Amino acid sequence: MIISASTDYRAAAQRKLPPFLFHYADGGAYAEHTLRHNVSDLAGIALRQRVLKNMSELSLETRLFDETLSMPVALAPVGLTGMYARRGEVQAARAAAAHGIPFTMSTVSVCPIEEVAPAIDRPMWFQLYVLKDRGFMRNALERAKAAGVKTLVFTVDMPVPGARYRDAHSGMSGANGPMRRVLQAMTHPEWAWDVGVMGRPHDLGNISKYRGNPTGLADYIGWLGSNFDPSISWKDLEWIREFWDGPMIIKGILDADDARDAVKFGADGIVVSNHGGRQLDGVLSSARALPAIADAVKGDLKILADSGIRSGLDVVRMIALGADTVLIGRAFLWALAVHGQAGVKNLLELFEKEMRVAMVLTGAKAISEISRDSLVRELGA
């Protein structure tokens, strides 16, 4: 199969993966309107094409939290990444580090912090959920610090899990889920051998380290689901801000008032995100929410954005709308599922090439030159 874009990796991943895994990552909440709008709204952002600007010198490099990034992209935290490729978190982290961008480890990764951090030559980021078990949260933070993590991504848009209908249909959850997952694995032998057999242990490594016993998919659905905390408030985050002395990013901001609260709280950054359309259907796409948030807090903290980004062109669009950097999730996961570390490496190269083309044709020689002026106003702002 010819791979020329992230959408090609998605098609290939759908063939390779058992349906319960493909649809778990591909699906969204309820009827998935926001999931679709994340992509379509971003694709509808029109850029101003500029010509005769002498674009012989071009730089994608940017600075973020005292880190140099080869381009304004980081790999987003994705739960169960290690179920999509053998020791998937390690492979994805290595590809990101080799390209000069951050990898963000999920709380619910298969590989534990202690396995991934030593595998790369730059500090990774760590994502943490708000959970009722504060002991686990403190344990995870202490272990992240010990592993050299500098940047914490704190996800605040999951006080309860979203209603994801696809999971029940695919076998990820619901009646006879375990039996359906086994049958699906049997009909996908390449995945069954590479990940199902050779990728063991199929463990939630960070949780197992804390609990002292192996955890599996049932624990992911059970223990974690029952531990999300709907009572959380900004006050509950104060001890984390005091404990964590590195950059702290609040992920899951869609409203300008919440962005202002993040500034008051002392956050170093926010992620404008609707969790990839996986939490509340009908909320704004990240592309539509971003401009108002940027107007409210640009310059007070760093603004990151995710949800719907499928190409380097989309990265340029998000930056023009007000982001400093973006996170990509599904796009890298599909590449990882198809070709492992080499797939993520190729995907990042594709994103970089697409960014370069977009910047040349919009007359932006550096990331700092991408702005609202890069947009066709009546269509993109």
From Swiss-Prot:
Keywords tagged on the record: Cell inner membrane, Cell membrane, Flavoprotein, FMN, Membrane, Oxidoreductase
Catalytic residues (positions): 275
GO MF: FMN binding; L-lactate dehydrogenase activity
Annotated FMN binding sites: 106, 127, 155, 251, 306-330
Entries under Gene3D superfamilies matching the protein: Aldolase class I
Domain of life the protein comes from: Bacteria
GO BP field: aerobic respiration; lactate metabolic process
Subcellular localization: Cell inner membrane
Recorded topology in the membrane: Peripheral membrane protein
Cofactors, names only: FMN
This enzyme's EC code(s): 1.1.-.-
Binding site for substrate: 24, 129, 164, 278
Domain FMN hydroxy acid dehydrogenase as annotated: residue spans: 1-380
Reactions the enzyme catalyzes: (S)-lactate + A = pyruvate + AH2
Matches recorded under InterPro entries: Aldolase_TIM, Alpha-hydoxy_acid_DH_FMN, FMN-dep_DH, FMN_HAD, FMN_hydac_DH_AS, LldD
Gene Ontology CC, one term: plasma membrane
Family recorded in the similarity comment: Belongs to the FMN-dependent alpha-hydroxy acid dehydrogenase family.
Role according to the record: Catalyzes the conversion of L-lactate to pyruvate. Is coupled to the respiratory chain.
HAMAP family, alphabetized: L_lact_dehydr (MF_01559)
Subunit structure: Homotetramer.
Protein name: L-lactate dehydrogenase
The species this protein was found in: Pseudomonas putida (strain W619)
Gene label: lldD
